């Protein structure tokens, strides 16, 4: 159960309502008028709670659960405890996400501009925005409607935010055009100089970074993540991409739609990713590469070559996943024999 000090629950909802909003089907014999007041994990749920099962590792917890309603895959229905109502979906986690969003909607901010915030006279702030203490909105910046600007945020000169954006405390955004429904978490740094130098024994000469950061709609950027602006071409983050905490994205990088970049990944300059690429935690991707659409990069992989669309790679240097697993098995056998 969510702590009410931090989360405000909506509802209750009937089984019929939850089925409609989740897109799941109701198992036979369930009471469509049954009411539920919250979501909860399998182990903590009670009769008026909704839970879900998406991973077979937790079948035991599912069978022991007291949840009144559970979202599951159809093939798991025969394992349900007696008396539990069921919503059946081929993608239980996604259906549950819709239900959880209904119980915990993201409300519009309470409009307010803190007395200690500073908004330049030439900046434009949309209706219904909340600008918290210490925030700075630079000259010519444009903030869309219903945006939340956290404490001590700095929005630089000329920056554009779309509607319904949230910028977490202490984040900075400069040289950037940001779409709508973008969530930038606390401490993130968007649009600072790319790491560009003409290197030589006589010293390293800084190359002016003259591009921008272009962020699409429905993007999340995690806490303390840094995204450098382009050197001339822009750095681009495609619609619907999800970027975890502590990620470094270099200048001129282009991410397609729906990319998922997990914590501590580093992407060097001018690498291009297609749509729906996934990179596991601490993967390192060198510069000037092409990563095809749908490619998957394992955690801690070191990518030093182009990756074909749909290919899965692992290891350092990264190779096709089957090769990496085979190499790891052979090395393990050799080590055991030697010992």
Swiss-Prot record:
NCBIfam families in alphabetical order: lipid_A_lpxD, PRK00892.1
GO MF term list: N-acyltransferase activity
Family: Belongs to the transferase hexapeptide repeat family. LpxD subfamily.
Pfam family, one: Hexapep
Organism: Paramagnetospirillum magneticum (strain ATCC 700264 / AMB-1)
Gene that produces this protein: lpxD
Function: Catalyzes the N-acylation of UDP-3-O-acylglucosamine using 3-hydroxyacyl-ACP as the acyl donor. Is involved in the biosynthesis of lipid A, a phosphorylated glycolipid that anchors the lipopolysaccharide to the outer membrane of the cell.
Record lineage: Bacteria, Pseudomonadati, Pseudomonadota, Alphaproteobacteria, Rhodospirillales
Record-given protein name: UDP-3-O-acylglucosamine N-acyltransferase
Subunit structure as annotated in this protein's UniProt entry: Homotrimer.
């Amino acid at each position: 159960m969510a702590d009410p000090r931090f989360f405000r629950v909506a509802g209750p909802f009937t089984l019929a309502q939850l089925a409609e909003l989740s897109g799941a089907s109701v198992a036979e014999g369930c009471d469509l008028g049954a009411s539920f007041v919250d979501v909860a994990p399998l182990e903590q749920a009670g009769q008026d709670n909704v839970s879900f099962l998406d991973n077979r590792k937790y079948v035991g917890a599912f069978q022991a659960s007291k949840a009144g309603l559970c979202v599951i895959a159809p093939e798991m229905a025969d394992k349900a405890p007696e008396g539990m109502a069921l919503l059946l979906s081929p993608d239980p986690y996604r259906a549950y996400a819709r239900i959880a969003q209904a119980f915990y909607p993201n409300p519009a901010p309470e409009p307010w501009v803190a007395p200690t915030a500073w908004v330049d006279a030439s900046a434009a702030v949309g209706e219904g925005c909340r600008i918290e203490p210490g925030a700075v909105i630079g000259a010519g910046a444009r903030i869309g409607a219903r945006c939340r600007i956290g404490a001590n945020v700095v929005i630089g000169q000329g920056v554009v935010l779309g509607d319904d954006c949230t910028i977490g405390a202490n984040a900075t955004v400069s040289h950037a055009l940001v779409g709508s429904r973008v969530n930038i978490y606390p401490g993130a740094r968007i649009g600072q100089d790319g790491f560009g130098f003409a290197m030589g024994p006589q010293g390293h000469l800084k190359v002016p970074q003259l591009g921008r950061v272009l962020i699409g709609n429905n993007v999340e950027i995690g806490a303390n993540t840094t995204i450098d602006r382009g050197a001339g071409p822009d750095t681009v983050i495609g619609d619907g991409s999800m970027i975890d905490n502590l990620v470094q994205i270099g200048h001129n990088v282009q991410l397609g739609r729906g990319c998922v970049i997990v914590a501590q990944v580093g992407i060097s300059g001018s690498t291009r990713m297609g749509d729906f690429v996934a990179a596991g935690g601490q993967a390192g991707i060198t510069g000037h590469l092409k990563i095809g659409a749908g490619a998957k990069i394992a955690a801690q992989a070191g990518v030093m070559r182009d990756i074909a669309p749909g290919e899965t790679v692992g290891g350092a240097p990264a190779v096709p996943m089957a090769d990496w697993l085979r190499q790891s098995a052979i090395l393990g056998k050799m080590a055991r024999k030697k010992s």
